[in-house]
Structure formats: C-alpha cells, structure tokens
From Swiss-Prot:
The gene is gatC. GO terms for molecular function: asparaginyl-tRNA synthase (glutamine-hydrolyzing) activity; ATP binding; glutaminyl-tRNA synthase (glutamine-hydrolyzing) activity. It catalyses: L-glutamyl-tRNA(Gln) + L-glutamine + ATP + H2O = L-glutaminyl-tRNA(Gln) + L-glutamate + ADP + phosphate + H(+); L-aspartyl-tRNA(Asn) + L-glutamine + ATP + H2O = L-asparaginyl-tRNA(Asn) + L-glutamate + ADP + phosphate + 2 H(+). Gene3D superfamilies: Glu-tRNAGln amidotransferase C subunit, N-terminal domain. This is Aspartyl/glutamyl-tRNA(Asn/Gln) amidotransferase subunit C. GO terms for biological process: glutaminyl-tRNAGln biosynthesis via transamidation; regulation of translational fidelity; translation. Belongs to the GatC family. Allows the formation of correctly charged Asn-tRNA(Asn) or Gln-tRNA(Gln) through the transamidation of misacylated Asp-tRNA(Asn) or Glu-tRNA(Gln) in organisms which lack either or both of asparaginyl-tRNA or glutaminyl-tRNA synthetases. The reaction takes place in the presence of glutamine and ATP through an activated phospho-Asp-tRNA(Asn) or phospho-Glu-tRNA(Gln). Heterotrimer of A, B and C subunits.
C-alpha cells in the first residue's frame, strides 16, 4: 500500500493540519516509510509467542477497597470561601 499526494492532503484536512504544497512530497515519503515498516512487522512470525503489555513484569499494588470520607473533609472545606452544612456554598447561576 502506498500513499499518494491526495491522500496526504486528505489526512491533513481530517487532522485539521495546515500543509503547504511543498511539504506534501516529504510527508508522502514519511507516511510510505511508516506503512512499509508496518508491512514488515506483519511478516514477523509470532506463532507461540505469549502476548505481553510490558517488557518488565509489573504488578499493581493492591489495597483493601474500603469506603471512607477521605478523612480530610474539614481541610478541603477550609479552602472554600463559603460553606453551609458541610457543603461548598456557591452563587446561584440559574433562576
């Protein structure tokens, strides 16, 4: 598969990128090089290779899922210019 100048202009238009006429040949070459590399990757034999998400084995640290109030509600509300009944008080915007 190869990209022509019209396709480069179409991609630029869809991406809302301004591309000058003199830039089109360079971008066309870049896109064709990327597509050639992707085609080269598709030829690699991956039969029997386990899929992985990272080259380094990683595990997420797990914690107990406990519902709490965050333990800092008073500190958070202390930053508010106005509060009422432990809630932020904001100006009315809709009548």
């Amino acid at each position: 598969m190869s990209v022509d100048a019209a396709t480069v202009r179409r991609i630029a238009q869809l991406a809302r990128i301004a591309v000058k006429d003199e830039e089109v040949p360079h971008l066309q070459g870049e896109l064709n090089a990327m597509l050639a590399f992707i085609e080269q990757l598709s030829e690699v034999d991956i039969e029997g290779v386990e899929p992985m998400t990272s080259v380094i084995p990683m595990e997420m640290k797990k914690r107990q899922d406990v519902v709490n109030d965050g333990e800092i509600a008073d500190l958070v509300l202390a930053n508010a210019p106005a509060t009422e009944d432990h809630f932020f008080l904001v100006p009315k915007v809709v009548e």
